[in-house]
Amino acid sequence: MFPFGPHSPGGDGSAGAGAEEPTPHEGQAAATGPPSPLHPGADATHPPPPARSPRRPGAPSLSPAPRSGELGLPGAPESSTASAPGEPSPPSPPCRRPGPDCRAKSRGRHGLGAGLGGPGARLFGWLKERSLGRGLFVDPARDNFRTMTSLYGSIHPADSVYLSTRTHGAVFNLEYSPDGSVLTVACEQTEVLLFDPISSKHIKTLSEAHEDCVNNIRFLDNRLFATCSDDTTIALWDLRKLNTKVCTLHGHTSWVKNIEYDTNTRLLVTSGFDGNVIIWDTNRYTEDGCPHKKFFHTRFLMRMRLTPDCSKMLISTSSGYLLILHDLDLTKSLEVGSYPILRARRTTSSSDLTTSSSSSGPRVSGSPCHHSDSNSSEKHMSRASQREGVSPRNSLEVVTPEVLGESDHGNCITSLQLHPKGWATLLRCSSNSDDEECTCVYEFQEGAPVRPVSPRCSLRLTHYIEEANVGRGYIKELCFSPDGRMISSPHGYGIRLLGFDKQCSELVDCLPKEASPLRVIRSLYSHNDVVLTTKFSPTHCQIASGCLSGRVSLYQPKF
């Protein structure tokens, strides 16, 4: 396992019996001075050493010192280098502590090494490399990341499935099952398709899954998944019984655009163009539906996401605002409807923030009037929590993300994704005139402040890139890779793989002081129409993309 000689850690000390190393008897015979009066177990105290005069590096000592690499043996007589009683002892070379892989039996009578060029030096070199974080013994995933980067760098279009626009329409969303065994396709013409991503074989078509466009698909586990549609409903499905729906959920009054799921509480969270965020208790679902409650309301709602640990909820709007609910508690908010406003950043005026009395939550609007619930929510903030420096639960932050090169205030945030480890958020923004598009990465700063107004924003722009301005009026869904090191973004008639640097490092390892461009790792073009959605497989080195003309393409490494 280790490229060492017979004295490597874990090796047998007897295997090196023929090596030319001094034995304890030879070392003892070489000693010329009287033995030290101190012996193991003696209770004596060394006097404090006096100030030493400076000595040139490498100057010879008064008595021969042991060779580099030799360690003293317990119970062996002291050499002549020991000073007489009452005299200060010269400083001894520091003893290096053996690593955890060194076993006691390998420390036999030869010690750990016998010189600078012996196996001991190689051992200490290996320990140094390991302490610096190099090699598989510290972080095996580092080499795995290098391998994945190499694989994605050699990725090519592997297969494609053409879906007739007459029967299926455009591809609006793609979603893999958590185990990567099923790829689901949300189609424009009321259908959901299921494929085997490994063989590219069609498994099942859920004809008339909805009565209008299917917008989003979300897996709850390896067998249950949910779909939402412009028909204002959400449907639950079971992969083991696809002939009928598990149940249909009614509660929205307009197009339902995306679905989130809290695995800890088993609560389903949906959002739609009616401005409502609704929570569904899937623990008590029946054929007629399941209990639900309006959790939040805001105007111009586009997308809603939960962080991986479900500690934050992010909501993007077509007016350029990003709403962040900190210290999220979905279960508590079913009874408590107060949302203290922590801060408003880069808003046009203080009157832009109002609270909807029907949902007891603040919303962004152009109305100059305030509802009384906004002031009452601040009164409900615990004074004790303010004194102790603790933010209230479900506290709201309103942010206008900084976009480099924006010509006018207020960009439409059309797509919203979160880093798999919750470090950052990924936004795709378009200008008000719809003539510019860009992808931006924002790092989450420290937790939300306690004071209602703070000069610091919790999001910081770290990376950005300009996108192709094609397919106006359609939302382009981008995504992070499962490890969070790469981004797959629709780009014209294909996709681009983007990284934070050329080595595809993790975000925390390459955070710039100022916003810097994303690096293009690879560009892939295999469609004949505008790509609307793309997705990484959670288990395989595979990417899927879907376009406006109904074509689904799969990308895999090719050597």
Curated annotation (Swiss-Prot):
The modification Omega-N-methylarginine is found at R134. The modification Phosphoserine is found at S53, S63, S89, S92, S349. Pfam families: WD40 (PF00400). Keywords: Methylation, Phosphoprotein, Repeat, Ubl conjugation pathway, WD repeat. Residues 87-97 have a biased composition (Pro residues). Residues 370-381 have a biased composition (Basic and acidic residues). One of its GO terms (cellular component) is Cul4-RING E3 ubiquitin ligase complex. GO terms for biological process: protein ubiquitination. Residues 1-119, 350-396 are annotated as: Disordered. SUPFAM superfamilies: WD40 repeat-like (SSF50978). InterPro entries: DCA10, WD40/YVTN_repeat-like_dom_sf, WD40_repeat_dom_sf, WD40_rpt. Interacts with DDB1. May function as a substrate receptor for CUL4-DDB1 E3 ubiquitin-protein ligase complex. This is DDB1- and CUL4-associated factor 10. It comes from Homo sapiens (Human). The gene is DCAF10.
